[in-house]
């Protein structure tokens, strides 16, 4: 049974939504949860009937959002450090944390190490599309500066992820640029294009709109661009949702119409809600680490745990190692 270490202290709202999410996950799937944090704060929030099903690892320190990411390396008593160490020591297969994302990625990369052949790990986001399937975009923040060789590997890792997690036989892969033509892009994307030409599934350059129109399964970019895309998308979704609510409240007719369209709004929310995904996997490292939003509610934590379980069960890491090894042999 898969063991998942959960950083109980990492979220913006304390341990309660994280513990509640863990309990929700236990009700639906078989796994072994390990809550890492201050036992004095966790136990009062943990119903007695779950105390024999959830173990607690004491951690009396918390890396806050105001701390530098590299400070986490010196904080061996912090909840995220101890959660990562559980994976390193083989006591857990995956980590879920809604805490300091920079600290989580730094610890995961330096304490767990990269997979064989991986130059840089990448953070993956699953974006909503007009179809029922989400698009995979990476990197969305693990690397601000990247080389063409890194983006080439992101394409390989993203393809493996899409194959294993979404059962896509040959995922289509696009390189995010300012136009579809081969001549478009900056020096980085042009150099990456040359490396990806001929790679199975590569369809060329794609534009920002292609992230959401389901024309491409995997979109590759550097972490600076990817993070801007992610944050801008969150902002647009939040603004549109707010405007719809505001305009509906202003008109009795609109309120009636909204009631009639309630089912449509529920389906739309399900497709757009980050809590449905749970978090962003950091791929290319030993083990499994899911980086969740600081504002994660119990539903988001539950789905982050589910994502970690699926990641471990499908063997994504082994697939990545094998694919990179095959590419290396072809180059030689």
UniProtKB/Swiss-Prot annotation:
Reaction(s) catalysed (UniProt annotation): a fatty acyl-[ACP] + phosphate = an acyl phosphate + holo-[ACP]
Localisation: Cytoplasm
Signal sequence residues: none
Enzyme Commission number(s): 2.3.1.274
GO MF annotations, alphabetized: phosphate:acyl-[acyl carrier protein] acyltransferase activity
Main location per the UniProt record: cytoplasm
A Pfam cross-reference name: FA_synthesis
Membrane-spanning segments: none
GO biological process: fatty acid biosynthetic process; phospholipid biosynthetic process
Enzyme class of the recorded protein, top EC level: transferase
Keyword annotations from UniProtKB, A to Z: Cytoplasm, Lipid biosynthesis, Lipid metabolism, Phospholipid biosynthesis, Phospholipid metabolism, Transferase
GO annotation, cellular component aspect: cytoplasm
InterPro entries per the UniProt record, alphabetical: FA_synthesis, Phospholipid_synth_PlsX-like
Record-linked Gene3D superfamilies: Isopropylmalate Dehydrogenase
Superkingdom, taxonomy of origin: Bacteria
Pathway(s) per entry: Lipid metabolism; phospholipid metabolism
Function per UniProt: Catalyzes the reversible formation of acyl-phosphate (acyl-PO(4)) from acyl-[acyl-carrier-protein] (acyl-ACP). This enzyme utilizes acyl-ACP as fatty acyl donor, but not acyl-CoA.
Subunit structure: Homodimer. Probably interacts with PlsY.
Protein family (similarity comment): Belongs to the PlsX family.
Official protein name in the record: Phosphate acyltransferase
Gene transcribed to yield this protein: plsX
């Amino acid at each position: 049974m898969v063991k998942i270490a959960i950083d109980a202290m990492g979220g913006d709202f304390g341990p309660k939504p994280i513990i509640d999410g863990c309990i929700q996950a236990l009700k639906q799937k078989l796994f072994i949860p390990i809550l890492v944090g201050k036992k004095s704060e966790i136990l009062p929030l943990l119903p007695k009937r779950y105390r024999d099903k959830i173990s607690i690892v004491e951690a009396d320190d918390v890396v806050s959002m105001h701390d530098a990411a590299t400070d986490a390396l010196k904080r061996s008593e912090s909840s995220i450090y101890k959660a990562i160490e559980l994976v390193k020591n083989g006591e857990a297969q995956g980590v879920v944390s809604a805490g300091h994302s920079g600290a989580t990625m730094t610890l995961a990369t330096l304490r767990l190490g990269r997979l064989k052949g991986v130059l840089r790990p990448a953070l993956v986001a699953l974006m909503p599309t007009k179809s029922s399937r989400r698009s995979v975009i990476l990197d969305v923040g693990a690397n601000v500066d990247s080389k063409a060789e890194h983006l080439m590997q992101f394409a390989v890792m993203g393809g493996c992820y899409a194959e294993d997690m979404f059962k896509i036989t040959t995922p289509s892969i696009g390189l995010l640029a300012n136009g579809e033509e081969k001549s478009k892009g900056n020096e980085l994307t042009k150099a990456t294009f040359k490396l990806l030409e001929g790679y199975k599934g590569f369809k060329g350059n794609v534009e920002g709109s292609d992230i959401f129109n389901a024309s491409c399964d995997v979109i590759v970019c550097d972490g600076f661009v990817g993070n801007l895309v992610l944050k801008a998308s969150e902002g647009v979704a939040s603004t549109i949702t707010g405007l719809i609510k505001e305009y509906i409240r202003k008109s009795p007719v609109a309120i009636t119409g909204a009631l009639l369209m309630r089912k449509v709004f529920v389906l739309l929310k399900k497709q757009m809600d980050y809590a449905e995904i749970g978090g962003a996997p950091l791929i290319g490292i030993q083990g499994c680490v899911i980086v969740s939003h600081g504002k994660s509610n119990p539903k988001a934590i539950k789905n982050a745990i589910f994502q970690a379980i699926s990641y471990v069960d499908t063997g994504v890491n082994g697939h990545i190692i094998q694919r990179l090894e095959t590419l290396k042999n072809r180059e030689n």
